[in-house]
Amino acid sequence: MSSSVGLDTIVSSLVKSSPPGELDGISQDLSAILSSKSNSSTVNTAIEKYINENSGVFSSTYIASKINKHESSTKYIDFIGKKLFNIDLHKQTAIDFEDYEPEVKYPAYFDELVKKLTEYGEDHYPSKYAFTIVPDGSDLQIIIIGQKLNYENFYTGLWKSHYKIKSGSIEGEAKLDIHYYEDGNVRLNFEESTSGTLSSSNASEIVNFINNAENEMTLKIVEDFNELNQKYFKNLRRLLPVTRSKINWGQAIGNYRLGSDVVHNK
């Protein structure tokens, strides 16, 4: 019993630490290591929980999240296309679509908001972009996800922002996660919150707020990264020995004394 609880915790922790765009690889590795049917169920449960909590993009368009999860089934609601869909965790695709009429009231500006968010993504997100809107009368929530997945050059990145509009006010948070793993393993995480008041609840006002907020967040990321690079990384470099030569951490590590000792187990 205790070993089963321990396994659940370990699997959940590994899945939770998954870098952007690499969840399928982690899923395959865990499934290969934990080959029994019960353990496979443990992996799938951990992945479903991760997706519900953090949101995921399927078929490059559809977002699955706890905020658009259908209450009485395993499916998710696409409020824009008015459909239910399931997800294939391993192929990262949306499947098993069916027509659905949500039992919520849509704001009058909903269609215009869809149009403006589409244009916003085309203008500001250079790679994969998806969004979903969850209406509830005059209130609504928006999730925006931008991904840049460059496996050939060993880096993946994800931007996710979540906004809540209620009674003329808007609050949101953005998370940035970048993973670089060529001859090393570097991870950059950034989180920032924002809030404000809308002079009027319409599509233009909402998207303008999102645009301004995300521009400010982007500038803050650049400033924080420059400070990290110029201050902390620079101080770290001063603690390292000056060899006046580039260390090839891959092929030539054995040529250095420390590397030779490691290679030959001295």
From Swiss-Prot:
SUPFAM superfamilies, A to Z: Subunits of heterodimeric actin filament capping protein Capz
InterPro entries: CapZ_alpha (IPR002189), CapZ_alpha/beta (IPR037282), CapZ_alpha/beta_2 (IPR042276), CapZ_alpha_1 (IPR042489), F-actin_cap_asu_CS (IPR017865)
Pfam families, A to Z: F-actin_cap_A
Keyword DNA-binding: no
Cell compartment(s), UniProt: Cytoplasm, Cytoskeleton
Gene3D superfamilies assigned to the protein according to its UniProt record, in alphabetical order: F-actin capping protein, alpha subunit, F-actin capping protein, beta subunit
Major location category of this protein: cytoplasm
The protein's assembly and partners: Heterodimer of an alpha and a beta subunit.
Similarity field: Belongs to the F-actin-capping protein alpha subunit family.
Protein name, per record: F-actin-capping protein subunit alpha
Native organism: Debaryomyces hansenii (strain ATCC 36239 / CBS 767 / BCRC 21394 / JCM 1990 / NBRC 0083 / IGC 2968)
Recorded name of the encoding gene: CAP1
